[in-house]
Amino acid sequence: AQFYQGSQLSFGKNRVQYNDFYWTFYRFKNYDVYNYVGGKELATYVAEQAQNEMDAMERTLDYRSSSRFQIVVFNKLSDLKQTNIGLELDDQTYNIGGMTKVIGNKVLIYFDGNHQHLQEQIRAGMARALLEQLFYGGNIRERLQASILLNLPQWYTQGLVTYLSKGWTSEDDNKLRDYIMTEKKPVLNKLIERDEIFAGQSLWHYIITTYGEASLSNLVYMTRINRSLESGFVFVLGVRLKQLSAD
């Protein structure tokens, strides 16, 4: 990787900042990794892991990255909260273990002292970055045009990112079992109302367990090509979403 000496890079001008960040970055084939004072070792780790995770995600999704993106690494959560990237996000969105933030072509990652959390953020960041490229294109014009034609629900996109970054654990099994036990008629729509992202994660787990790993990339591909959520399920799985939800 090439190392570039940075300057006072600006990502926006509307949020109060208590520290000035002097950014430098490492350049890789498909992305740049930004860091500031005290974050060189962390950025090096993130850069190495990001390449591994990107390779794995590209294989899983059967898709190769079509454009460059930036990974912005923060030494701690309080520094991330000062960033001007994505001002529409409030402090509640930066919860520990929450969804990695991907804004445009930027992936925001912070270190909370837990390397497992960091790894999940990197994995989720690579998944989200690739999925956004796959569904909506690499530049702003493509994304605006595609978003008009294809508006995917949170349970589909964020549920998939969660499944790709965390998989399915015994805790998830217990959580789903509790839901089934407490609902008289447990169906996906009710679970979506209760916990949309977990509902999506559960559905993706069911799809891959029932129809095989290749169904994931095939379903994503057909959804993109047909610009239709329903068509993707019918073409790949042979069932409508309503029927799948009932199962």
Short names for language-model regions:
Residues 1-2, 238:
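Generic low-polarity alpha-helical segments
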Residues 2-147, 153, 170-171, 188-189:
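Juxtacatalytic substrate-recognition/specificity segment
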Residues 90-247:
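Acidic/His/Gly-enriched intrinsically disordered linker/tail segments
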